[in-house]
């Protein structure tokens, strides 16, 4: 018996081929054959898709499981949605870029970027790129690709990268982290007002004039000299002082008239007193320079006298023969510009030559001189020490020249130099 083909209706379902209402009951619930690639029987008797991670079904639709930072945009495209965090000076800008936020002052601005820079930062423009650079001045430089401090000797770096000064002999670092000089206290070096100084002792001093051109107070160390000592042209110590001699009182060699014999300032007296321990070595001469009875000598004149009187301090009294402005301590060929106030050491000793008006043997020094140095014209010179009882003077000396009356008529009075000595007061 042949079987005829069965016709299929339009609503025939090959998975569930039998209509539960019209056909006979299905003899078996076993599903037709299917591939396990992408399919599964879940629940039992139901054929369904088997999605793997990250797919899953949601509201009857297959969709993707989205984790943190991933999302779908309005068109259904998968996008990243990362939540970024920034702390000042970082901030977010367009297209999720984060620039540095700088102090809002006017500075060069990088084109197309919201950067503002304060010096030393700036933009180095080129045809290819605009490069952020840092400007630096003296003392800084590049070492490889790093900014570094440039050091010159004696500066260097220690093992920890700190700047230090290389110290040599004569310098050290104190406990207070200060650089200090090493000095030899035992060799005459000391600190004075924060500076190194020479510790000079007795007999030494600093000079009064600078020895270095253009340097103030560059004074040399000198031997400290007492009264009566000086340096000669070779720098050796010598007795006396050729520039400022406090061992010599004199009238100077100036030819100007300085004393009175018969009239005011009619003669030039040259008198030099030099202290030699307890003795005074003296030289005297006199010359009339103005017209009068001594220039020329008249027949009525046979003597000439010069008087010098001093107070208790040995200061010359001006109301007597010699002008005070031509009398003082020797300084070169002149006298010290500052009037002296004490010269008792040059005065005739008041014990050896007591003050008296009468002529005594011990008060007088007698010698012979010559008229204008002519040995054929002798004169008698009498030097009297402290030979006055004048209450205004404590010490005195006078020079009395005498000759035979009528001997030198017509000549100008002048007496050659005469040297003598006497005992000093001190």
Swiss-Prot record:
A Gene Ontology term for the protein's cellular component: viral capsid
Transcription regulation recorded as keyword: no
Keywords annotated in UniProt: Capsid protein, Host nucleus, Host-virus interaction, Late protein, Viral attachment to host adhesion receptor, Viral attachment to host cell, Virion, Virus entry into host cell
Miscellaneous: All late proteins expressed from the major late promoter are produced by alternative splicing and alternative polyadenylation of the same gene giving rise to non-overlapping ORFs. A leader sequence is present in the N-terminus of all these mRNAs and is recognized by the viral shutoff protein to provide expression although conventional translation via ribosome scanning from the cap has been shut off in the host cell.
Subunit details: Homotrimer. Interacts with host receptor CXCAR. Interacts (via N-terminal tail region) with pentons.
Function: Forms spikes that protrude from each vertex of the icosahedral capsid. Interacts with host receptor CXCAR to provide virion initial attachment to target cell. Fiber proteins are shed during virus entry, when virus is still at the cell surface.
This protein's domain notes: The tail region anchors the fiber to penton base capsomers, whereas the shaft, built from several repeated motifs, allows the knob to protrude from the virion.
Entry similarity comment: Belongs to the adenoviridae fiber family.
Protein name: Fiber protein
Species, as recorded: Human adenovirus E serotype 4 (HAdV-4)
């Amino acid at each position: 018996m042949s079987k005829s083909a069965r016709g299929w209706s339009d609503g025939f379902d090959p998975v569930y081929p039998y209509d539960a209402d019209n056909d006979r009951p299905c003899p078996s619930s076993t599903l037709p054959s299917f591939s396990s690639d992408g399919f599964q029987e879940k629940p039992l008797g139901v054929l369904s898709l088997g999605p793997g991670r990250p797919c899953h079904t949601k509201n009857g639709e297959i969709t993707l499981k989205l984790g943190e930072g991933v999302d779908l945009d309005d068109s259904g495209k998968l996008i990243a949605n990362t939540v970024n965090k920034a702390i000042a000076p970082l901030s977010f800008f367009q297209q999720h870029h984060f620039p540095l936020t700088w102090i809002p002052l006017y500075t060069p601005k990088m084109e197309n970027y919201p950067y503002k820079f304060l010096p030393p930062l700036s933009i180095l423009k080129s045809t290819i790129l605009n490069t952020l650079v840092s400007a630096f001045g003296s003392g800084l430089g590049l070492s490889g690709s790093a900014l570094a401090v440039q050091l010159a000797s004696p500066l260097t770096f220690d093992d920890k990268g700190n700047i230090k000064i290389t110290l040599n002999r004569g310098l050290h670092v104190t406990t207070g982290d200060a650089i200090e000089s090493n000095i030899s206290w035992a060799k005459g070096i000391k600190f004075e007002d924060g500076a190194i100084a020479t510790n000079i002792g007795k007999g030494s001093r600093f000079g009064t004039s600078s020895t270095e051109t253009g340097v103030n107070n560059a004074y040399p160390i000198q031997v400290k000299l007492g009264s009566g000592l000086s340096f000669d042209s070779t720098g050796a110590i010598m007795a006396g002082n050729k520039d400022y001699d406090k061992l010599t009182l004199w009238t100077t060699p100036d030819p100007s008239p300085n004393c009175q014999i018969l009239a005011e300032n009619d003669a030039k007296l040259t008198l030099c007193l030099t202290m030699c321990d307890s003795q005074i070595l003296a030289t005297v001469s006199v010359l009339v320079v103005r017209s009068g009875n001594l220039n020329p000598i008249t027949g009525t004149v046979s003597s000439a006298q010069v008087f010098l009187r001093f107070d208790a301090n040995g200061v010359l009294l001006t109301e007597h023969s010699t002008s005070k402005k031509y009398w003082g301590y020797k300084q070169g060929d002149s006298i010290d510009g500052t009037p002296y106030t004490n010269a008792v050491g040059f005065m005739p000793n008041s014990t050896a030559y007591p003050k008296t008006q009468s002529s005594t043997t011990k008060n007088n020094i007698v010698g012979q001189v010559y008229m204008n140095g002519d040995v054929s014209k002798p004169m008698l010179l009498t030097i009297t020490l402290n030979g006055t009882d004048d209450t205004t003077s404590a010490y005195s000396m006078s020079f009395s020249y005498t000759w035979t009356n009528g001997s030198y008529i017509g000549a100008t009075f002048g007496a050659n130099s005469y040297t003598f000595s006497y005992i000093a007061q001190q």
